[in-house]
Amino acid sequence: MKLQFTKMHGAGNDFIVLDGIHQKLDLTDAQWRALANRHFGIGADQILIVEKSSRDDVDFRYRIVNADGGEVEHCGNGARCFVRFVTDRGMTDKQSVRVEVMNGVITLKLQDDGQVTVDMGEPELTPARVPFIADGLPTRAEAQDTLYGLEVNGRTEWISPVSMGNPHAVQIVDDVEQFPVLQDGPVIEHHKSFPNRVNAGFMQIVDRNTVRLRVFERGAGETLACGTGACAAVVAGIRRGLLDSPVKVHTHGGDLTIAWQGAGQPVQMTGPATTVFEGTIDLSTLPA
């Protein structure tokens, strides 16, 4: 079986994009993992699938498969690549596209300068809906936010749980480049307080409109950028009274701009979406 694919990235967060409307996609978990493998497959942080939606008020369905073969709820950088893909392929001529994801509907808009703005929806801040189990954990209040203390590698680290359609734990650090992200990230990802695991975000505040961010993504490890992670980090920073909208988020892969006007309002994310190359791969050549 041969698959046509497009390799894309959003601020260095890289994806395999597959048209699931004009070709059949019936892959096993092992085949998804093999596609994402950087040594034996194409290589990517995640695989994005374009499908038809069953809803009349939605243009497409958007599915995301992690490098570990598991399907996840949302990916903001991937959403920007998604709308660039369907536009460049002539699958839509709309400037604003509504897309169905696992937990709802998002709106994607192409800007005149080539950037893409994604309406990411409202953040979910109720712990049980992240989901996050807070029972027995120490807490402390900062402005409008409640922080929870997690035991991580012998230290208590204070995190803000936020869902952007997928779960995030946001931690503020003094120097994100010196912080042990690769050591603490896996511990937080698999912490028992997050029943579905979690994306661990480490944010350094530069000023009230600028941050530096690293994210250890659930099922993918540290990536060059994480769109939902950038949104969750800015929401946490604003709720803690440390940031003002809009916020420029510097990641290792590039910059994102995040805007949020507070409770009851959606988060807006703007950033790049770039096509790297296209090709065809024979699944029979991949390791089982």
From Swiss-Prot:
Substrate binds at N13, Q46, N66, G76, N77, N166, N199, E217, R218, G227, T228. Pfam families: DAP_epimerase. Gene3D superfamilies: Diaminopimelate Epimerase, Chain A, domain 1 (3.10.310.10). Its EC number is 5.1.1.7. Pathway: Amino-acid biosynthesis; L-lysine biosynthesis via DAP pathway; DL-2,6-diaminopimelate from LL-2,6-diaminopimelate: step 1/1. It catalyses: (2S,6S)-2,6-diaminopimelate = meso-2,6-diaminopimelate. HAMAP family: DAP_epimerase. Catalyzes the stereoinversion of LL-2,6-diaminopimelate (L,L-DAP) to meso-diaminopimelate (meso-DAP), a precursor of L-lysine and an essential component of the bacterial peptidoglycan. This is Diaminopimelate epimerase. It comes from Cupriavidus metallidurans (strain ATCC 43123 / DSM 2839 / NBRC 102507 / CH34).
